[in-house]
């Protein structure tokens, strides 16, 4: 049937049809890099990674742009407060760009661990000041902006469609709710395109209105248009960005005379103890702590168990349950790979039919607004039939089962990178198994069964374990 998405702008599910056949342009609002990422920062990247993987599976060429905000995002998300990165730089006694680099790489490392594909382009806001200045000047020339005391503000009431994404009406927006009243503003609803730098402000650039720095909203408008062009296919981000950030992006672009994003998608919050996970409140679980203690793919699986438009309530019990569920799928995939090597030639009709049903149910789920819970349910519904048929399954059908697991489970869901499919023994388990084999070898030596003793030693050597007999007893080391 093709992909159907819930379009926030249309307020309904709509068929997704790219502007240029065979090509898809996606812009996702990326992180403001002033601290380590928490679990809430992983949900959007994982969700839109599924979308990207789906398009790649379908043969599309995908340009996936996700920015890095390293300037201009103030502490209250509006036009007041301190730049978040500058504030952090003061706390850590670093230069702002040192802070941005440090936490940008922290974010990228976490995304790599979660098997999220790197963006085609990851533009940094600080590298696109000329584009922002050009857009600001264009808005001034068209009467949609005005300058006051070195700052430039967007004249919200000059754009009658302001509010069409969020459903908010100008008359209903109260001064002081999400915007602060400043004396130089014509209207309290107006927002900054360019901010005059106060004395001592570290991050500043020259502009026609004096030294300053960009407003948060203009950054994504300028960068998305630069890399994806007018009328690009999809803009996505968290539900908390819908207003004011995305609303302001639309106003800036369209008031400047540009066609902006054709479709909009928004993912919901990750909750902890019933409250939104957020840096500002400290109500969070850091991603790196989770990734160190748990299999990253089990964490990705956990994120996919809830539909992206629904709030996800994080619990430790839920994570443990997800680890068990992921383990069941991983075990089944490994079983298929292992049995394929020794299975007799031919096909197994019952398995072929089960695979047909799986592929149909899975793709229907994904194409219905990325219903990952239903896609996972299709995989689990397939497991009983698979386990029943595995003992007698033929090689060609097992090869197809492996390919289906790879296409659906890794190609689209991103759950089975090669490293998790390689069953490796390490740590205490490895040491225990070697100790057991050496004990059996010592028993054989005491019984003067040197043939068995030598056989154990040679088999261990073939596996890369070197055994050395000493006065204190046998020692072993891994061959380098």
From Swiss-Prot:
The keyword Zinc applies. The keyword Nucleus does not apply. One of its GO terms (cellular component) is cytosol. A motif ('HIGH' region) lies at residues 31-41. It comes from Thermus thermophilus (strain ATCC BAA-163 / DSM 7039 / HB27). A motif ('KMSKS' region) lies at residues 276-280. Binds 1 zinc ion per subunit. This is Cysteine--tRNA ligase. The gene is cysS. It is found in: Cytoplasm. Keywords: Aminoacyl-tRNA synthetase, ATP-binding, Cytoplasm, Ligase, Metal-binding, Nucleotide-binding, Protein biosynthesis, Zinc. One of its GO terms (molecular function) is zinc ion binding. Belongs to the class-I aminoacyl-tRNA synthetase family. ATP binds at residue 279.
